[in-house]
């Protein structure tokens, strides 16, 4: 007992001396470890075990609650992930009403590719025609000096003329010279009179021929003076050659128009002939001015120029060709023939009013398929089959319908042409929702 009282006195907490209760002792030593106890009673041991058991139970219950809470949080987070996956397709339809779905932009890209494919073919023909025309002009310029030199020297034509003028100068000389000239003129007259038989018989006697030749010599001295001057003769011949060149250029222009019509078929010829009436009946939303404005955008140039011929990759060349009235008229007729329905044209017009591929709204739409507008249009431009199939009005209407409501694809299950286009688009762009 004395040891116990000393232990109690040495404790940091103040306790009553001479009073020992098991409850107070153990309640005061809850903070110590069980290894420090040297004195223990039966009742206290049972109390300690119970407290330990309760503490273990409390720990287990707390751990169970923590585990349950963790499990609940994990399950709830998983539930949020699943719901977010299910909700994400439902969030895609609202943006198309404001900006346009990626499918609509794919349709615009297909339209661009179809347009520029036809433009490329036109430009190739135009470039070949210009090259051929320039080559013909060079050949004419090379032939003109040769022809003028030939006419100035006078190998073919001047031979008969000096024959008539030759006797005019030696008219007053001796008889030998007159006989030589008469024999020479006689030989030449037989050559000229050999064509009709009656004139040959009439010209058979020699004296008659001499008389006629003398009469002709007397009547033609004035002409010989004009014939002897070579510059006037060359000027006349050059004028004739120029007139010939004008006829050749006009005939080339006339022959070029039927060639273009035959290559493209009769429908294009009718459309080109009826150009004043066709725009009034049907006018495309994409005009030549809008096309020229879009081609001034550097991003559009980077997308389109690699697929155009080399003659059109220069912006100045493209602008020069767009200012050509003939080419501009043909391009307008082609755009009018490519125009789709009124709904498509109105929506495309609204989209192209503020045409900006770098706008954040457009980028947000293309993020759904994981591509940029440049990549979309470049992929379509690299596949001319899709571009040519887009010229079908039914395909345009189907893309317009499915861009607003992806479930409308069910209506086109039996249309092979439409489904082929959708299948090609889905192969090129797997992230596009709507078509299979």
Swiss-Prot record:
It is found in: Plastid, Chloroplast inner membrane. Residues 297-331, 373-412 form the STI1 domain. Residues 1-39, 40-72 form a transit peptide. One of its GO terms (biological process) is protein import into chloroplast stroma. It comes from the Eukaryota. Involved in protein precursor import into chloroplasts. Part of the motor complex consisting of a co-chaperone (TIC40) and a chaperone (HSP93) associated with the import channel (TIC110). Causes the release of bound transit peptides from TIC110 and stimulates ATP hydrolysis by HSP93. Involved in reinsertion of proteins from the chloroplast stroma into the inner membrane. This is Protein TIC 40, chloroplastic.
């Amino acid at each position: 007992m004395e040891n116990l009282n000393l232990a109690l006195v040495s404790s940091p907490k103040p306790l009553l001396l001479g009073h020992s209760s098991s409850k107070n002792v153990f309640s005061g030593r809850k903070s110590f470890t069980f290894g420090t106890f040297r004195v223990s009673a039966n009742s206290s041991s049972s109390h300690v075990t119970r407290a330990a058991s309760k503490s273990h139970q409390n720990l287990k219950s707390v751990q169970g609650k923590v585990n349950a809470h963790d499990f609940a949080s994990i399950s709830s987070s998983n539930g949020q992930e699943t719901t977010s996956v299910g909700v994400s397709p439902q969030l895609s339809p609202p943006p198309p009403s404001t900006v346009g779905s990626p499918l609509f932009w794919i349709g615009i890209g297909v339209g661009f590719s179809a347009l520029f494919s036809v433009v490329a073919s036109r430009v190739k023909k135009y470039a070949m025609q210009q090259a051929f025309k320039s080559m013909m002009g060079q050949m004419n310029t090379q032939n003109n000096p040769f022809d003028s030199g030939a006419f100035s020297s006078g190998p073919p034509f001047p031979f008969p003329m000096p024959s008539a003028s030759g006797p005019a100068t030696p008219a007053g000389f001796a008889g030998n010279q007159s006989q030589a000239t008469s024999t020479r003129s006689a030989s030449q007259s037989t050559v000229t009179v050999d064509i009709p038989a009656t004139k040959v018989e009439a010209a058979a006697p020699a004296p008659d021929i001499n008389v006629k030749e003398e009469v002709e010599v007397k009547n033609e001295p004035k002409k010989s003076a004009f014939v002897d001057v070579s510059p006037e003769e060359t000027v006349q011949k050059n004028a004739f050659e120029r007139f010939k060149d004008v006829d050749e250029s006009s005939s080339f222009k006339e022959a070029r128009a039927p060639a273009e019509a035959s290559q493209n078929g009769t429908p294009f010829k009718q459309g080109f002939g009826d150009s004043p009436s066709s725009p009034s009946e049907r006018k495309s939303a994409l005009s030549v001015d809008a096309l020229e404005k879009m081609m001034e955008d550097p991003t559009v140039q980077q997308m389109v120029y690699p697929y155009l011929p080399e003659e059109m990759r220069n912006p100045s060349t493209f602008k020069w060709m767009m200012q050509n009235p003939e080419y501009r008229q043909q391009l307008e007729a082609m755009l009018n023939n490519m125009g789709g329905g009124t709904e498509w044209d109105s929506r495309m017009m609204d989209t192209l009013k503020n045409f900006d591929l770098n706008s954040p709204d457009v980028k947000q739409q293309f993020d759904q398929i994981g591509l940029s507008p440049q990549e979309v249009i470049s992929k379509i431009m690299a596949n001319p089959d899709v571009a040519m199939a887009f010229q079908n009005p039914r395909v345009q209407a189907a893309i317009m319908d499915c861009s607003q409501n992806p479930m409308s694809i069910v209506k086109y299950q039996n249309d092979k042409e439409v489904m082929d286009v959708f299948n090609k688009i889905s192969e090129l762009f797997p992230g596009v929702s709507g078509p299979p």
